[in-house]
Amino acid sequence: MAQLTPEDAGAGWRLLPHTADAILEAWGPDRASCLSQALLGLVRSFAEVPDTAATQLLPIAAPPGGPEDVLVSLLEDLLYVVDVFAVVPVRFHLTETEGGGVAGDMEVVPAAEVEVVGPVPKGVSYHGLSMGPRDGGWRCHVLIDV
């Protein structure tokens, strides 16, 4: 599994084993940064992100909804992009939109340029899903189906 990010960082993520799946936890000072960390954690569950510059910029967005719905929408969108376009996102830039949605872009590189460290997740589960304000910031917890 990917390297853990220190818990005491202002923003970060970690992966925890869970039978045949993985639990992704992410945190940040605000919702957009927590979502960005969750996206990065999902990528790092299957790929070692290169330090090279991104070759393309793709849009990513989630419509207004509850925090958990926005999280799942973004994670599923990321998995779709990886599967359909054979690219791997390496950085995310998200901002809040009116009504509670999120929009931004992701810097991507061709999938052939990353080191595969695990299987690409199949999806995201609603089981045990949580996201919300906590400890002066935002935290999320999501089960990843690998």
State what each model feature region is:
Residues A2-V146:
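N-terminal intrinsically disordered, cationic/polar leader segments
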